[in-house]
């Protein structure tokens, strides 16, 4: 879908929202369209008229407009889009949203070791189709706030039942996802980091026949042999090496490294006498003992080198959920900059922007992904948009065919004053959207100039 066709996108995502009145649904679609068109800007700055501004604020203040109803429409749209893909990765991760605005902070909970910080905890699940490198959409998202009175009382949390702990979020996400996807769930592989290495969660996934790849955090006991899980690599089946692209993060530079893969079936046991868990264990590590090492647990059967490498490739895609949270929180949708008067109003906007952020991520990812960067840029830019961008950035005669997505992504970033100082070829969120806004100003100027050719 062309990026500037925001209304079609918004109608596809939110057009089925059940808000008790069709006029509210239409207003939601209009608001989402404006927020997508001017990603990162406020309601006032993104709306096209004062009537739109007033309508948007009435919608956000309406107690009959439930955040879950807004999200439900988006999840339904994602489930509908998922039906056409033979394999899907459910990329999961948690984050916190930090809101410093004084009017709403008292309704929020603690989020960090800083007792003054206030916000929401969030657990998100993105569906991604690895076969075509396509971002399908957001299929699940939970929001909650920690009680301020429980700050610093970790020992009390350990005594709670599993269903009342934050760690239950992983199983809860799988339950919700299975309800929404139905038969499609059998094509889904959940991909989670070390926080999901929870006995109850692994047991649940296996008992429900759900597929997963989880990075192990705990050096668990083995049922069929003495010793523990992390001492197994010397006795595993070798599966060759794999080139891993380590993305730039914080002060860590982007790099490529050779990872050596080995695998075997394992049975993990618990000291309490519960039945062991039968899984496949894959070890992926650098030759340097101090280098990176992934201990992966999966429900998938691995019988050869190709299958082992495929599992490692699935886990590599997990970083996309971290990129999604960046697109949502800071560089793209800038959800943490919201200034709403109540928590309910805040959650309505947070929910809408959660889906806008998926759209932001999909644009950047298609432009930098090796699988899609050579596709035509007309999948995201209209002919007028890419031609104006070409004239502005290249200053040459227009090519006979549209340039690739990689060119479009980098050209938008350069228009936003991006300089590839780290030599990664991966522009950040802010420069892409600065470039996008400048391009839209160019398009508007071009159309106004064209209109002068008509009689007034």
Regions of interest found by a model, annotated:
Residues 1-106, 114-121, 126-456:
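Single, function-defining residue in the core of a domain
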